Every structure is written in structure tokens, then in C-alpha cells.
């Protein structure tokens, strides 16, 4: 029974049906209490926390994350500890927009997964890590995305291949290598449609971004519209990002008043669903719109908010810590590869 409950929680979580995930996680908690099963209790905390976090219920999500961290540490269960570290990383990124803390949690999970040879968790954490690097606009994330992609293929795991492909595509887009990005995004789209993966807006946004870069505004617009249609079955950050993409095209077409409405809509969604990812860019473009309309008072007002949001995201001291962590990851990975090749010989 407990395996069936775990399967259902994971299934609905992957589909983005958070209320069903929470329902089954609560049933799991009741079963765990009755049968005095602490491991099952731990899983119920993890699933509840992930679903609550993704549906913008940040306070209760944090409480369940803390409970899972405490219990996983007490039970000395490395596999669930990897999941908890991963979830804490996503919480830091989505709710607190603290990308540095997010990366620290993800590195912790990656190290633990590496030590225990948890290949699947290791690959998924790499995909999440690459995504945070994209949000930081830092191309150093390419190696994590490609490693996730290669592991997905060697494990023949469609979801991990998809995660690796979509994150590699975002990275190549950041590096202005659009042809390479297109190669990976097409593979991601095929897998996403074959398996009906959740958050398809994330993939459509990148198609939109690449086409926008190429000056193909009409085609780009179609993809942003597709992404915005996905409201119920997409992550908040993807929906917000689609608003940003759509607004940038309207700005190109000198339709600033319409762009302003879309940007304000995106900001409203990001506050309503408690997810600050991309909010800084919405404010930046809002300021630009008002500037283009010669409404300098509003332009300045939104520019100040943009600066506040932006300054809290990027920090020189934290960048230094980050490069040290990256160096550590690289050297540990080298050691593991050397060990592995000695075993293979």
C-alpha cells in the first residue's frame, strides 16, 4: 500500500496536480502514523512540501521541509536526504529567489548522491542545478546540463533526457548558439509530447526566445501564446516568463500600453503565487515601456524596484564562494571518473 501511495504522489506531482498530490500525501501520513512507520512519514512530508511550494503555499511548505530535513537526518537515510536537499534548493530559488543558497543545497545533494552512486537522483539534481545557472544568466551551467543529458541516455530514462535536453538548450541559447539550442529543444519537445510531461510552457518559452532573437516575431508570439495557455499545467515561473516574452514583442511593435498590461499581469501572478523568478526582468521592461512613452516618473519608479530586486539577486562575495564550490565539484568528478576508468579496465 505504501508503494502505491508513493507512486500516486510522484505521478500527480510530475503532472503538476498539486491538490491530488497533497491529498495522497496526507493519506500517506495517516497510514504512517497508524503503522508507526517513520520512513513513510518522511515521504509524506517531502511530497506535501513539494506540492505546497509549487502551489504558492510557502509557509506550510517550509514547515514540512524542515520536518523532512530533521527526520531524514535522524533516520540517516541518504536517499531521502538527497530529495530533501533538492527540495530545499528549489524552495530557495522559487520562493526566496536566493540562487546562491539554492546552489549550495543542490551541491549538497549532488555530493551525497555521488558518494552513494544514486545515479537517478544525481542526474535530476544536475538538471535542477543547470536551471538555476540559467536563471543567474551564468553559462557555467552548461556542463551540468550536458552531464544530465548524457546520463539520461545511458539510463534510457526519458524524463532525465528531457531535463538534460531542455536545460542544455537554455544554456546554448544563453551562449548565443541558437542552432545548437534548437537541436536540443526539438528533442525535448518530442519527449515532452510523447510522455505528456508537466510544465510544457518552459519548453515553448525557449522556442519563443530563440525565434525572437532571430527577429521571427510572429512565430515567437505563437509559442508565447501556447505557453500562456498552459496556466494550470505549468510552473509559475514559466507562466510569468511567457508574459515577459509576449510583452517584449509588443514593445518591438510599439504597442507599449498593451505590453504594460501584460507585464503588470505577470507581476500580479508572481506575487499571487509567491514566486519571484523573472520578477526583476518584468520590472525592468516595465520601466523601459514608460520611458518609451516619455512617462519618466513611472519609468523611474519601476526602475528603482528593478534595481532593488536585482541587487538582492547578484552578489560578488557569493560569486566567489560559488566558484570555489564549482572547483570542488570538478575535482571530485575528475577523481570519480579516474576511479571509474580504473574499475572498467
Which residues does each predicted region cover?
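Structural motif corresponding to the intra-repeat A-B loop/turn of tetratricopeptide repeats
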Residues: 15, 35, 55, 75, ...
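Amphipathic alpha-helical segments of tetratricopeptide repeats
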Residues: 26-33, 66-76, 107-117, 146-156, ...
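Conserved alpha-helical positions within TPR/SEL1-like repeat arrays
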Residues: 3-14, 40-54, 79-95, 106, ...
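Hydrophobic positions within repeat-based interaction scaffolds
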Residues: 2, 7, 22, 139, ...
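TPR-repeat structural position
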Residues: 18, 38, 58, 78, ...
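Coil residues (strongly favoring Ser/Thr
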Residues: 4, 18, 34, 78-79, ...
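Inter-repeat boundary and helix-capping residues of tandem alpha-helical solenoids
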Residues: 35-39, 75-79, 98-99, 116-119, ...
Amino acid at each position: 500500500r505504501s508503494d502505491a501511495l508513493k507512486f500516486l504522489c510522484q505521478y500527480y506531482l510530475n503532472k503538476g496536480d498539486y491538490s491530488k498530490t497533497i491529498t495522497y500525501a496526507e493519506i500517506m501520513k495517516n497510514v504512517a502514523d497508524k503503522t508507526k512507520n517513520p520512513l513513510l512519514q518522511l515521504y509524506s512530508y517531502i511530497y506535501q512540501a513539494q506540492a505546497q511550494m509549487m502551489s504558492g503555499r510557502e509557509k506550510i511548505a517550509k514547515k514540512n521541509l524542515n520536518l523532512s530535513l530533521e527526520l531524514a537526518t535522524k533516520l540517516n537515510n541518504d536517499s531521502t536526504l538527497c530529495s530533501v536537499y533538492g527540495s530545499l534548493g528549489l524552495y530557495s530559488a522559487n520562493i526566496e529567489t536566493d540562487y546562491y543558497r539554492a546552489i549550495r543545497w543542490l551541491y549538497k545533494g549532488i555530493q551525497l548522491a555521488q558518494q552513494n552512486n544514486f545515479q537517478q537522483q544525481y542526474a535530476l539534481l544536475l538538471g535542477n542545478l543547470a536551471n538555476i545557472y540559467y536563471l543567474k544568466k551564468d553559462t557555467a551551467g552548461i556542463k551540468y546540463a550536458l552531464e544530465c543529458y548524457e546520463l539520461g541516455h545511458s539510463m534510457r530514462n526519458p524524463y532525465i533526457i528531457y531535463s538534460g535536453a531542455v536545460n542544455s538548450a537554455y544554456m546554448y541559447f544563453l551562449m548565443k548558439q541558437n542552432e545548437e539550442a534548437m537541436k536540443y529543444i526539438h528533442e525535448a519537445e518530442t519527449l515532452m509530447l510523447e510522455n505528456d510531461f508537466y510544465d510544457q510552457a518552459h519548453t515553448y518559452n525557449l522556442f519563443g526566445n530563440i525565434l525572437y532573437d532571430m527577429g521571427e516575431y510572429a512565430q515567437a508570439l505563437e509559442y508565447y501564446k501556447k505557453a500562456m495557455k498552459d496556466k494550470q499545467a505549468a510552473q509559475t515561473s514559466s507562466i510569468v516568463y511567457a508574459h515577459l516574452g509576449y510583452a517584449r514583442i509588443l514593445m518591438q511593435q510599439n504597442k507599449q500600453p498593451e505590453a504594460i498590461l501584460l507585464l503588470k499581469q505577470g507581476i500580479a501572478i508572481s506575487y499571487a503565487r509567491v514566486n519571484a523568478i523573472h520578477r526583476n526582468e518584468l520590472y525592468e521592461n516595465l520601466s523601459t515601456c514608460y520611458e518609451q512613452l516619455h512617462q519618466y516618473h513611472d519609468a523611474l519608479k519601476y526602475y528603482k524596484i528593478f534595481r532593488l530586486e536585482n541587487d538582492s539577486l547578484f552578489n560578488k562575495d557569493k560569486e566567489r564562494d560559488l566558484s570555489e564550490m564549482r572547483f570542488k565539484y570538478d575535482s571530485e568528478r575528475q577523481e570519480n571518473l579516474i576511479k571509474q576508468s580504473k574499475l572498467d579496465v
